[in-house]
Every structure is written in structure tokens, then in C-alpha cells.
Amino acid sequence: MGWVPDEWSIDHDTLIDAGGYVQKLKLYPYFDAAHYVLTCLSVRHDLGPDAISFSRKHPFSCWLSCMLMSFAGSFLSCFLLGEPIISPLKQHADILLGSIVWYLVFYSPFDVVFRLATWFPVKLGLSVLKEVQRTHKIAAGVKHAVRIYPESYLVQILVGVAKGAGSGVVKIVEQLARGTWHPTNHEILRPSFTTKACVIASIVFTLERHSMYVTAPHDLVYLCVVGFFIYFKLASLCLSVHDVLMPIENVLCAVFMGGIIDAFAKAVDATKKAIHSNRVLSEEEILSKEREKVLKKKKLLAQMSNGTDKKNN
């Protein structure tokens, strides 16, 4: 007998069926609505304590910011593939649902929708729905890029990442739409764990599409990626584990990005300075230092004599 009871065991076919079921879920309206709610909450949080006054004074700018962030992945992927950037707005049902969510988050009576959405159990459920939608977007982005650029793995990975984590890049444009801009704080310069996870998921889907190193059934791979996103999202919300890849990055950067070499160079320089400060001076260096002291004394005496002459005059 193992540690896990036999009743808890799940066979391979059941997991594949579960992955196929999750993959065929319709995102509209529930999963999309969860995405819009969390996006509007992110915009409102980014606005800070002036969010209410800003939404009253500049409603169009507030709406445009939320729409840019809600469809950021589609905007960015269209830009990368040379497709019309405005094409994500062709579905009026998506725009209508996003606008309704935006209105409720910013203008609901007594701010009841915002308070309900930020309540931890509700936010937890919305986050799970959004991670399922994120996986669907990454898989769809890789599939679309494979159809257009079948020989370019880099393009396929980039489009998948853009679909899953495009809001971090488009955030610069969104900030311009509401009159603020922070050029030193964007996703390319400081990628979040979500972007890193999207890169990993996009690589997995790309390799699986080409049957390279990932030979498991597509439905099983899809289910594993969904579980990967949900697990780390719950860990971030419940346990405040925000970036599990940071220790690995620090080690890799120290080994392959010059960290060890730079530390060794600093140690050598410090050793040289210590040796130079503690070594015995030669006779010439001692004589030169004595001459410098004598010259300094002569200059001081000359200055003092000049001062006394001026006083006597």
C-alpha cells in the first residue's frame, strides 16, 4: 500500500477527459467577466486614492484605460503579427460586457460592487476563472502564430506571451491615456511572475505543437498548465508567494551573466588595495614624503610672515 488511498487515484484517461472539458469551456460571459472585473480593479488600484474623483472628472479616459487593459493581449498580438490593431474591438458583445463591468466597478451605488469584488473569497474565485482564461489565450495565441509562421518558434512564443500577459506592456499606453507615465516601471524592464509564467507556458505549448520534448496528449498538457497557473495564483493570494522563480534567476545570473566574474574582480581589487596600504615604503618614497612635508611647512611660514607684514603696514 502506498501513502495515497486507492480511492484517490486518477487514471490517465480521466485526466485527459478533464483537460478536454476545461479546454472546451466557453469563456463568454463568466470567464471574460471575471477578467474584466480584475482588470478594472487593477486600473482603480493604480489610480490610487484619487480613483473616485478621476472617474467622475474624466469618465472617458477611465473607460478607455479599462478597455485598453482588458484587451491588451489581443492588441499586442495583433501588433506583433501585423494585423489590424483595432480588430479585438469587432465583437460588440465583448465591448458591452466590459463597459458594464467598468461602470459597476467605478459607479455602483455605495461602491458595493467594488467592495464585493475586493472581498477575499470573491477575489479568489475571480482569480481562478481568470487563470483558466489566461491559459486559453496563450494556447490560442500559439495556435494562431503556428498557422501564420509555422517555422518560427520565437514568434509563436512571443504571441503566446503577448496574449497571456500583454497588459503589462500595454500599461504604458494606458497610463498615457489617463495623463500619467512611468517609463522606468514597465513589464519589459521588470517582468512580473505572471509574465515569466506565461513565457514558460508559451514555450510548453510551442514544443507540444511541434512534438519536441513534450509528447503528452494536448488535453493533458493543457490541464497541467491550467493547474500550474491556478496553483501559483492561489499561493500568491493566500501565502504571499509572489515570485518563486527569483532564487533560480539569481543563481543563473550569478553563474552565466557575469555575477561571479564581477565578484571575483571586486575581491582582487580589494586585495590589491589592502596590500598597497600595508606594504613597506621604499627610501625614495620616504624621502619624497619628507620633502612634501618640508615644502608644506615653508608655505605655511611664508603665509604667516605675509600676514604679519600686512598687519604692521
UniProtKB/Swiss-Prot annotation:
InterPro entries: TRIC_channel. Residues 1-28, 83-90, 150-151, 211-216 are lumenal. The chain crosses the membrane at residues 29-48, 58-82, 91-108, 119-149, 152-178, 193-210, 217-239. Residues 49-57, 109-118, 179-192, 240-313 are cytoplasmic. A 1,2-diacyl-sn-glycero-3-phospho-(1D-myo-inositol-4,5-bisphosphate) binds at K130, R134, G168. Its main location: endoplasmic reticulum. It holds the Pfam family TRIC. It is a multi-pass membrane protein. PANTHER family: TRIMERIC INTRACELLULAR CATION CHANNEL, TRIMERIC INTRACELLULAR CATION CHANNEL TYPE 1B.2. Belongs to the TMEM38 family. This is Trimeric intracellular cation channel type 1B.2. It comes from Caenorhabditis elegans. The lineage of its organism: Eukaryota, Metazoa, Ecdysozoa, Nematoda, Chromadorea.
